[in-house]
A protein has these predicted regions:
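His/Asp/Glu-rich metal-coordinating catalytic cores
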Residues: 2-22, 26, 32-169, 174, ...
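Short acidic low-complexity segments
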Residues: 8-21, 72-75, 212-226, 234-242
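Short, well-ordered alpha-helical microsegments
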Residues: 37, 92, 114-115, 176-179, ...
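Short hydrophobic/aromatic-enriched beta-strand-loop microsegments
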Residues: 48, 63-68, 187-194, 313-322
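Short, charged, surface-exposed secondary-structure boundary motifs
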Residues: 55-56, 76-78, 115-117, 139-141, ...
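Active-site-proximal loop/helix segment associated with metal-binding centers of metalloenzymes
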Residues: 87-97, 110, 114-115, 121, ...
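Hard-cation-handling environments
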Residues: 149-231
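C-terminal regulatory/interaction regions
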Residues: 185, 216-363, 368-376
């Protein structure tokens, strides 16, 4: 039903693309991150929850955005299309396609951990499941969110006692709002970089409850930064903007913090393992929950996932992509290179590609079926 082209995944029967890489006439979009939402398309179909952030990011192309409720079916040239929660960020969706009795689901980016800032991931039964694999290696297993946010708040409180401002870096759309939701506002004021503040205001307008925040530049002007935590995109580290806060302790929240040496390479004082993607056992459990007989793997460490699923008896192959999700090669320690290397295949107009050549030991990476069920 879908084939890869030089513009991304194409549904020939419906004549539309899913998360295209280049401008097209009609795009069905999973979410508003830049590697999925492309400027210049004539028409976009997104979820109701994701419409505001999509329009904000599209600028002059925002007029082409149409939105549907989760679970609401649209028929596009005979193909029944519906969007279902992906749990990645506000409005993130999986795309379900049904045509002539065949059902495909495109996951987009997703996580199965609960998140108060977006609708929870929903397993959707299908014949073919296209899954991301950003953290598709057995070394990626997330600690509990309670533990992570406990560590973040303790770090912030310790910095406050020592008279330093705390800078916590996370991507401006999605990660930043999830971080804000987990902070303890009794410790001190929560300040936001401009890029974060705009997206945070859209989350609030969308009904997401978040602690009070203040625009960081306003706090700088009035010198009200004592004991504060500043939520900002990673690009601010080492900037003149950051130096205006005086003595600062820095941290980065990402799934990459699970890998040895990532904090040092990021040049931050602390690292917290918090991802908006599935980890290894969650990915395997999500595939099981769909009941899919065929799995196509993209956006990340495709080879190990394909090998594992093939060993389980599934028809699994990799789909080449221009993007690698949030892959950060700088975060991979040289000592982990043997399990973190994958052949990158150039996109082509041919049918979906075969698996890449990365290897893995399935016996060393079995997920516990009782502890790796998806969160619904």
């Amino acid at each position: 039903m879908l084939r890869q082209t030089d513009r991304g995944l194409y549904c020939e029967a419906g004549d539309f693309f899913i998360d295209p890489w280049a401008p097209v006439a009609r795009a069905v979009v999973t979410h508003a991150h830049g590697d999925h939402l492309t400027w210049g398309c004539d028409a976009y179909l997104v979820s109701h929850e994701g419409a505001a952030v999509s329009r904000e990011r599209l600028g002059r192309w925002a007029a082409g955005v149409e939105s549907v409720a989760f679970g609401e079916a649209r028929t596009i040239n005979g193909v029944h299309v519906s969007l279902h929660p992906a749990g990645h960020i506000l409005g993130s969706a999986q795309v379900r396609l049904e045509h002539r009795g065949e059902v495909w689901v495109v996951s987009g980016d997703y996580k199965t951990d609960p998140d108060p800032t977006c609708a929870a991931w929903e397993p959707v039964r299908c014949h073919t499941f296209i899954t991301e694999s950003t953290f598709g290696l057995p070394i990626y297993r997330w600690p509990s969110q309670r533990q992570v946010f406990g560590d973040i708040n303790a770090w912030w409180a310790d910095n406050t006692r020592n008279g330093t401002v705390s800078l916590l870096c996370g991507y401006a759309l999605g990660k930043a709002q999830r971080l804000i939701a987990g902070l303890d506002p009794s410790i001190g004021p929560i300040l936001t970089h401009g890029a974060v503040e705009r997206m945070t205001s859209l989350y609030r307008e969308g009904g997401v409850a978040l602690p009070a925040t203040r625009y960081a530049s306003d706090a700088l002007r009035t010198k009200d930064t004592a004991g504060a935590i500043v939520i900002a995109p990673p690009s601010v580290t080492g900037s003149s903007w950051l130096r205006r806060f005086g003595d600062v302790r820095t941290a980065f929240a990402s799934g990459w913090m699970r890998v040895r040496g990532a904090r040092r390479r990021r040049g931050v004082d602390a690292g917290f393992t918090l991802s908006d993607h599935v980890d290894w056992p969650q990915l395997l459990a999500a595939v099981d929950a769909t009941g899919a007989e065929r799995v196509r793997v993209t956006h990340g460490f495709t080879g190990p996932v394909v090998q594992w699923l093939t060993a389980r008896g599934l028809d699994a192959r990799a789909i080449p992509t221009r993007w690698e999700g949030e892959r950060d090669d700088a975060a991979v320690d040289a000592g982990d290179a043997d399990v973190c290397t994958e052949r990158v295949v150039s996109p082509s107009a041919s049918p979906l590609a075969d698996a890449s050549e990365a290897t893995i030991n399935p016996e060393a990476s079995t997920a516990d079926p009782e502890t790796s069920k998806p969160s619904h």
